[in-house]
C-alpha cells in the first residue's frame, strides 16, 4: 500500500493519478530494475562460488590463506544475499503495486544499500586484483589457481557494474520521491 506524502509545509496530501499506460511504464521500469538486480545476484554468486572452490591440492595455494581473496569472497557473498533480498522486494512491488516497507523507507533503503554494497564490491575486487597481479610470478607452478582467482575477480567486477546500474535507478527513484513525493516519475 502506498502512503501519500504530505507537502513540506504541512498542506494536504496530493493524490497521484495513474493511467493504464503509466502503470505499464511503472511495471516495465520495475521489471528493468529486477533484471539488473538478478544479474548482480548471478555474477556475485558466481564470483563467490569460484573463489570458494579455488583450492588445488593439499600443498598448494588456498584462497583462504590470502586476506584479499577472503575479502573478495565475503563481499561477493554479502552482495549476493542482498541482491536476493532486493529481487524479492522487486517481485513483491511488481506483483502487488506496493513496496515491502513504507515508501519513504524503501526508497532510501534501496539507494543507501545499493551505494554501500557497490563500493564494497568495488573495493574488494580492486584488492583482489592487486593480489592477483602481485602473485603473477608465483603462478608458474599454480596456473589453475591464478586463472580461477582472475575469473572470480572478473565476475565480481561485472556484478559491480550491474549493482552500479541498479544504484543509478534507485537514485532516480530517490530524486523522483524528493520532487514528486512518490518514487514514480509520472
From Swiss-Prot:
Glycosylated residue positions: 125
Predominant cellular place of this UniProt entry's protein: membrane
Positions on the Extracellular side per record topology: 53-71, 125-150
Pfam families, per the entry: CASP_dom
Superkingdom of the source species: Eukaryota
Keyword Transport: no
Transmembrane residue ranges: 32-52, 72-92, 104-124, 151-171
Localisation per UniProt entry: Cell membrane
Cytoplasmic side: 1-31, 93-103, 172-186
InterPro entries attached to this UniProt entry: CASP_dom
Record membrane topology: Multi-pass membrane protein
Keywords: Cell membrane, Glycoprotein, Membrane, Transmembrane, Transmembrane helix
Ligase as UniProt keyword: no
Cellular component aspect of the GO annotation: plasma membrane
Assembly, per entry: Homodimer and heterodimers.
Similarity comment text for this entry: Belongs to the Casparian strip membrane proteins (CASP) family.
Name this protein carries in UniProt: CASP-like protein 4C1
Source organism per UniProt: Populus trichocarpa (Western balsam poplar)
Amino acid at each position: 500500500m502506498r502512503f501519500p506524502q504530505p507537502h513540506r509545509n504541512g498542506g494536504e496530501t496530493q493524490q497521484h493519478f495513474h493511467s493504464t499506460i503509466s502503470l505499464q511504464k511503472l511495471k516495465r521500469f520495475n521489471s528493468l530494475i529486477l533484471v539488473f538486480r538478478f544479474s548482480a545476484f548471478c555474477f556475485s554468486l558466481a564470483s563467490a562460488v569460484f573463489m570458494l572452490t579455488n583450492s588445488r591440492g593439499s600443498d598448494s595455494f588456498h584462497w583462504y590463506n590470502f586476506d584479499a581473496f577472503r575479502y573478495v569472497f565475503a563481499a561477493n557473498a554479502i552482495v549476493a544475499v542482498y541482491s536476493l533480498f532486493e529481487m524479492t522486494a522487486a517481485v513483491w512491488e511488481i506483483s502487488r503495486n506496493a513496496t515491502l516497507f513504507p515508501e519513504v523507507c524503501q526508497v532510501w533503503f534501496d539507494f543507501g544499500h545499493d551505494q554501500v554494497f557497490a563500493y564494497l564490491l568495488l573495493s574488494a575486487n580492486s584488492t583482489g586484483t592487486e593480489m592477483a597481479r602481485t602473485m603473477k610470478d608465483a603462478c608458474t607452478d599454480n596456473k589453475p589457481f591464478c586463472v580461477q582467482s582472475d575469473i572470480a575477480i572478473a565476475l565480481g567486477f561485472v556484478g559491480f557494474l550491474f549493482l552500479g546500474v541498479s544504484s543509478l535507478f534507485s537514485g532516480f527513484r530517490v530524486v523522483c520521491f524528493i520532487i514528486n513525493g512518490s518514487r514514480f516519475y509520472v
